[in-house]
Amino acid sequence: MRGFPREVLESVWKIVDDVQSGGLKAALEYSKRLDGVAPEPHLVTPRQGGDPEVVSAALAAAKSLEALYSRISPPAAVDFYGGILRQILWKPVRRAALYVPARYISTLVMLAVPARLAGVEEVYVVTPPRGVSEELLAVAKELGVKAVLALGGPHGLAYAVFHMGVDVVAGPGGLYVQAAKYILSQYVGIDGIEGPTELVIYAEGVPPEVAVRGALAQLEHGPTSFAYLLSPDGELLKKAEELYVRERTSSMGPLKVKKVGGIDEAVSFIDEIAPEHLEVWGRREVAYRVRNVGAVSVNMPSPYLDYVAGISHVLPTGGTARWRGVITPLAFMKPIGIAEAVGELTLREAARKLAEYEGFKYHGEALR
């Protein structure tokens, strides 16, 4: 998502300002206007209940994610140099707000597991009133969520930031939610700006039906989503495109096909697109050569990765995979530097000289 329409930003700025100054009353007024209901209570305590099969499936996804993500830890950095014990310590933020679009229980899993593993003390879910299902509340309880804020959109996020004291906001959502995250990033940390779903498929040596299946799955997210199918096999591309035209609905985004001369050309194209998802069939080395991508599924449909492969489906979009990646516990942590004098400070003169050169008199005097 590259930039926001001016009218969207102006509208969201007003909502954020109104909720900042007007608190819960303003947030509830916006909820009634935009979602048709002013929820009571606005904060819901997670509890057991709901369809046990759905809850069990969500917890199976959580278990898969935790098995991998529990192995992620910030690199330890401890060093003694010039009379100083130096360390980089990683600390979790105290409070996090996880934005979960209505009914997307899997997104709750993909955000709450990393936040919990990071050590966040208070994890809140922000979701529209219609998203507060018994299943969501049950999964939230199992994943250690403190409360569910039944206020969606910009007004819900603004309330969480200004009146619940969260330190980080994370999660996907529509245009107005992402505009709110952009504005609120002046006050709190965010995971990024997430836009429409993106998929690139590289297929070689598989039936065209296999290649098209993943594209149809991702493109059903809506007309603003898009997918590319790459292959050195022109016949595969032709049949796949025919299948897509036959199966697609009017609400789906476009599928573009491109014949490539080989892996080198494919990797170069993928890195230029920097897609959210990459689905690789037949040539696994493509997955390991690509630099700019959110997450890769190899010889499996991307929806398996979306739900249970153990990698969060909260991913960079809009080309931002060039500099950021899949969400992990590190999104809810921050590095703190500590320098402790434990011996003679051998670099004192170098520090004093730099202070003198830069014109900081009292810096220099403090170093004498």
UniProtKB/Swiss-Prot annotation:
Protein name according to UniProt: Histidinol dehydrogenase
Annotated residues for binding of substrate: 197, 218, 221, 277, 306, 358, 363
Enzyme class at the top of the EC tree: oxidoreductase
Protein keywords: Amino-acid biosynthesis, Histidine biosynthesis, Metal-binding, NAD, Oxidoreductase, Zinc
GO cellular component terms, semicolon-separated: cytoplasm
General function of this protein: Catalyzes the sequential NAD-dependent oxidations of L-histidinol to L-histidinaldehyde and then to L-histidine.
CDD domains: Histidinol_dh (cd06572)
UniProt GO molecular function: histidinol dehydrogenase activity; metal ion binding; NAD binding
EC number of the protein: 1.1.1.23
Catalytic machinery residues: 276-277
Cofactors (names): Zn(2+)
GO biological process, one term: L-histidine biosynthetic process
Classification via InterPro entries: Ald_DH/histidinol_DH, Histidinol_DH_CS, Hstdl_DH
Residues bound to Zn(2+): 218, 221, 306, 363
Gene name for this UniProt entry: hisD
Pfam families per record: Histidinol_dh
UniProt entry tagged with the keyword NAD: yes
Pathway entry: Amino-acid biosynthesis; L-histidine biosynthesis; L-histidine from 5-phospho-alpha-D-ribose 1-diphosphate: step 9/9
Catalytic activity line of the entry: L-histidinol + 2 NAD(+) + H2O = L-histidine + 2 NADH + 3 H(+)
Keyword Amino-acid biosynthesis: yes
Membership in a protein family: Belongs to the histidinol dehydrogenase family.
Co-factor: note: Binds 1 zinc ion per subunit.
